[in-house]
């Protein structure tokens, strides 16, 4: 899935979203995608394939995948890398 980062949520009250940096060859990325789906975090997730959209990965300084970045509008709130459990993801969002 190739999704570009879009900025078309005008009028929305909650501008938080998760950027999920991934690659087709990355096994932990596939596991993390399943954990994210199960966690049902309630935020939009934009998927960025670092091989297809390398300029975006460079812009965000991505050094490894999987990497998640929590954004509030255009501000990076926090990030984490590596495989995580559903519980770790929920704690990360709510922390």
Say what each PLM segment does.
Residues 1-8, 44:
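N-terminal "domain-start" segment that seeds a small globular fold
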Residues 6-39:
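Local sequence-structure signature of Cys/Sec-based thiol-disulfide redox active-site neighborhoods
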Residues 21, 42-56:
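Thiol-based oxidoreductase modules, predominantly thioredoxin-like and allied folds used
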Residues 41, 63, 75:
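Structured loop/turn residues at beta-strand edges in well-structured enzyme cores
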Residues 56-60, 92:
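CheY-like receiver
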Residues 60-69:
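Structural micro-motif
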Residues 72-95:
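Non-catalytic, surface beta->alpha helical segment in thiol-disulfide oxidoreductase systems
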